[in-house]
């Protein structure tokens, strides 16, 4: 059992939208206490459900997301229970909640009230749209976060209805952002000596971050282009009706042609046609696509995957849940397990923890029965003027609320000496060997919060992110919009690791570092001479994080991988989209955005462990395993009932109607790349019978609210096809923004499906999301980048630009490594640097 967060107490006030945050902290060793209302939290009643169990214990979401936690029951509307809660706050480190903005203030439990009891308390709030802005009181669910965050727009078939990702990806991203923020804030408080802080996590902004590659803002600001579906999702149907996920890179193009020749596919290409394999190559008339389809027409799924492996292409099979348990890759790595639930008298199916990278492992214990740990409730105590006892953050509570016209209060400066977020990790040095997205985004998070992150790279084998287009349409190593977003705030040390001198420099640099991060294939670091045994001989307490695409072992361990291909092999794609369409998944490389927060959480947890024990450790954080672990609710339902979960398109088991409906376009008129009418959409999600009655009245059809076909959730689900037709007919002639606002005014969650133009120019809630940075050699070029998801209330957290290639060579060699100017010049002359 991981003990990294031993001694940390978390009060968890979350619903489904934030429950994963507390689960991650519990898996890392924190004591996480669910504070539930009488009758239990709403997550206990969600579908899918275990069969033949009492109502409060049957929800798979509760059993999976609340594993390793404890449960107490308190009515926070009751005076005595509020005092009992405050007494618990006095001994807590974190409170995580999903309550609507101002809800806890109305109960006398706002941030100031909590800090008055415990000035070292960290509060993290996860809400649909954050604590500030015009939309802060709007209701929101995963569907609306995906719509307003730009993810749904890039997901689905090019001419089809946009699709929501399976297994609630916006809830996942918000929860993971909260968990990583908790580790950052704990580090700041305990290492910098600061007091508590209130951290704001918006599900919408967490979602916007996931489209940073598919919908990089500079595509719009420099190229006048709006990315369209299907984004970065590519799957191919094979001869046996199975599917594979495939990416053909330019450096493997000739091997692809050789494979086509061996199979007998006539492709008509030569090595000179490699540009057709670029990600941004035209889709129409692409001979690479034609050759791929020809291969798939004569090969089964497994034959295709085996041939691609032989050609060293990035390819994995698209797997469903019925494939996973017995697949060698997952069996070898013990991906799935069962947990005994004695009170229920049964075994429950689980997936390995998302943070199982910890060297001391993660043991999973069953979720608590309602009120099982009531003995932990403290007696009411008089409130101190200020507290010095370490406290814990609670998990989010209710994600939705009826929109009101309450004015948005201006953020107030903290009254206590909380650490500035930009200095939260000051004093930590990270050597970043990361490549492309997954690891570099994680180290960007560390850099944004004050760690010194030194990116080790080389002009001789540059990261593909260094080849992004600049404002003039040609590749530029320093100006690329995505590169600047992914590497904001870092330093760059350009060195040739293939030379003895270069390797010696990096080895010496690591000797003064706290952690080393990489996302190479297993064994690559050892072959470079930088394996864990070597690093321990350099610095005994070093923390090394390896983040391979698949696992350390198994047939896929040595394969090249990309996020969207891993997504396809995880089971995710078979939970997403319409049953009659290709299982594309969503239009982003999903693991590239879940993994960074897990990287931050595990690295900081390992450093916390080192602080207490003096021990470093090697962490193995599989991107594939991490994504599979995020499908645990669906996996548990499948294991308990045997029913294969299907692709439910935009429908939901707990909300109905719940979908993406046709609408009209922006009232501001056309925009670059807009195809005109026919591709504008609005999302609507009804969570209760009362909300359905309100929506029916808004539609001018109040009789539908009490119609037996639609009066209850079960009735609406039975008649969902007819219901969707009614909703679509109502939304079709409305502007998507106005329609969503009308729904919100009557208490129904709704949001426009936003494209890049909408998120960058139109959405008032995202007005401050994009920050502008400049490079010294191009001061007039505005480069928009995404700000951090976790906003520390009361602070202006501005990010720095990314480094120019080799910008900090002299700093590293002379200041950090203590070499002379003459030595530095020799390294340049001998081509060791650069």
Which residues make up each language-model segment?
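Glycine-rich beta-alpha junction loops
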Residues: 39, 128-130, 203-208, 240-242, ...
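A short glycine-threonine-serine/GTX helix/turn-capping micro-motif
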Residues: 162-173, 196, 227-233, 243-245, ...
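Conserved PLP cofactor-binding pocket of PLP-dependent enzymes
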Residues: 307-330, 744-766
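Mid-domain beta-loop-alpha active-site segment that forms a flexible
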Residues: 144, 166-183, 203-211, 231, ...
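N-terminal helix-loop segment corresponding to the beta1-alpha1 unit
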Residues: 1-192, 218-222, 291, 302, ...
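Aromatic-enriched alpha-helical interface/lid elements that frame and gate functional surfaces
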Residues: 232-311, 315, 399, 657-746, ...
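Substrate-binding/catalytic subdomain of NAD(P)-dependent oxidoreductase enzymes
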Residues: 185-225, 233, 304, 317, ...
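Terminal low-complexity tails and localization/encapsulation signals of metabolic enzymes
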Residues: 1-9, 235-237, 321-429, 651-656, ...
């Amino acid at each position: 059992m991981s003990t990294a967060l031993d001694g940390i107490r978390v009060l968890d006030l979350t619903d489904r939208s934030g429950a994963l945050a507390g689960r991650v902290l519990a898996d890392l060793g924190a004591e996480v206490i669910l504070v539930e209302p009488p009758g239990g939290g709403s997550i206990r009643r969600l579908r899918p459900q275990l069969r033949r169990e009492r109502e409060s214990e049957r929800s798979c979401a509760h059993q999976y997301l609340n594993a390793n936690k404890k449960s107490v029951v308190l009515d926070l509307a009751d005076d005595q229970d509020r005092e009992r809660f405050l007494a618990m706050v006095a001994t807590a480190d974190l409170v995580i909640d999903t309550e609507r903005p101002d809800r806890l203030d109305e109960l006398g439990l706002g941030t100031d009230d909590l800090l008055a009891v415990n000035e070292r308390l960290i509060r993290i709030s996860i809400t649909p749209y954050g604590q500030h802005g015009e939309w802060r009181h709007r209701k929101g669910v995963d569907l609306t976060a995906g719509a307003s965050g730009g993810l749904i727009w890039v997901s689905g078939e090019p001419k089809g209805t946009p699709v929501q990702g399976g297994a609630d990806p916006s809830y996942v991203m918000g929860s993971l952002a909260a968990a990583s923020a908790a580790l950052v804030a704990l580090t700041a408080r305990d290492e910098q000596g600061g007091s508590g802080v209130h951290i704001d996590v918006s599900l919408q902004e967490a979602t916007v971050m996931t489209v940073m590659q598919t919908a990089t803002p500079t595509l719009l600001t420099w190229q006048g282009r709006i990315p369209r579906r299907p984004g970065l999702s590519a799957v191919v149907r094979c001869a046996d009706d199975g599917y594979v996920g495939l990416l053909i890179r330019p450096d493997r193009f000739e091997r692809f042609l050789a494979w086509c020749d061996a199979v007998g596919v006539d492709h008509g290409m030569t090595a000179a046609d490699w540009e057709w394999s670029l990600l941004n190559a035209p889709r129409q008339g692409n001979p690479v696509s034609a050759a791929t389809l020809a291969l798939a027409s004569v090969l089964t799924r497994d034959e295709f995957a085996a041939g691609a492996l032989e050609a060293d292409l990035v390819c994995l099979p698209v797997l469903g849940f019925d494939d996973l348990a017995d697949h060698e890759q997952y069996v070898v790595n013990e991906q799935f397990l069962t947990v005994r639930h004695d009170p229920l008298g049964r075994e429950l199916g689980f997936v390995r923890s998302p943070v199982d990278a910890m060297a001391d492992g993660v043991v999973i214990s069953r979720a608590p029965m309602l009120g099982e740990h009531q003995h932990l409730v403290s007696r009411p105590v008089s409130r101190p003027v200020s507290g010095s006892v370490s406290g814990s953050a609670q998990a989010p509570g209710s994600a939705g609320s009826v929109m009101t016209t309450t004015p948005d209060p201006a953020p107030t400066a903290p009254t206590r000496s909380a650490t500035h977020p930009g200095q939260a990790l000051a004093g930590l040095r990270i050597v970043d060997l990361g490549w492309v997205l997954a690891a570099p985004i994680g180290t960007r998070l560390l850099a944004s919060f004050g760690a010194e992150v030194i990116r080790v790279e080389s002009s001789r084998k540059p990261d593909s992110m260094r080849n992004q287009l600049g404002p003039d349409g040609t590749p530029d190593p320093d100006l690329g919009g995505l590169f600047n977003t992914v590497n904001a705030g870092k330093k760059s040390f350009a060195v040739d690791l293939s030379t003895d001198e270069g390797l010696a420099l990096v080895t010496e640099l690591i000797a003064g570092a706290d952690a080393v991060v990489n996302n190479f294939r297993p064994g690559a670091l050892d072959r470079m001479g930088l394996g864990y045994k070597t690093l321990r001989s350099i610095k005994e307490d070093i923390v090394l994080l390896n983040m391979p695409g698949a696992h350390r072992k198994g047939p896929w361990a040595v394969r090249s991988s990309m996020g969207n291909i891993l997504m396809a092999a995880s089971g995710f794609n078979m939970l997403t989209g319409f049953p009659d369409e290709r299982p594309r998944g969503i239009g982003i490389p999903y693991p590239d955005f879940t993994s960074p927060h897990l990287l931050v959480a595990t690295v900081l947890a390992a450093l916390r462990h080192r602080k207490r024990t003096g021990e470093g450790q090697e962490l193995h954080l599989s991107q594939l395993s991490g994504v599979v672990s995020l499908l645990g609710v669906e996996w548990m339902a499948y294991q308990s009932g045997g029913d294969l979960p299907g692709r439910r398109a935009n429908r939901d088991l707990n909300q109905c109607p719940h979908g993406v409906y046709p609408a009209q376009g922006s009232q501001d008129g056309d925009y670059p790349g807009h195809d005109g009418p026919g591709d504008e959409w609005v999302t609507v999600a009804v969570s209760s019978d009362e909300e359905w009655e309100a929506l029916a009245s808004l539609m001018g059809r109040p009789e539908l609210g009490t119609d037996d076909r639609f009066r209850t959730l079960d009735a609406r689900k039975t008649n969902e096809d007819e219901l969707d037709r009614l909703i679509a007919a109502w939304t079709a002639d409305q502007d998507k923004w106005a329609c969503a606002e009308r729904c919100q005014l009557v208490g129904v969650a709704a949001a426009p499906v936003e494209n890049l133009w909408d998120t960058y120019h139109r959405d008032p809630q995202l007005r401050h999301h994009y920050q502008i940075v400049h490079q010294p050699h191009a001061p007039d070029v505005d480069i928009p980048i995404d700000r951090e998801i976790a906003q520390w209330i009361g602070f202006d957290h501005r990010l720095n630009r990314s480094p120019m290639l080799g910008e900090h060579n002299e700093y590293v060699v002379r200041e950090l490594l203590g070499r002379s100017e003459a030595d530095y010049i020799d390294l340049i002359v001998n081509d060791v640097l650069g």
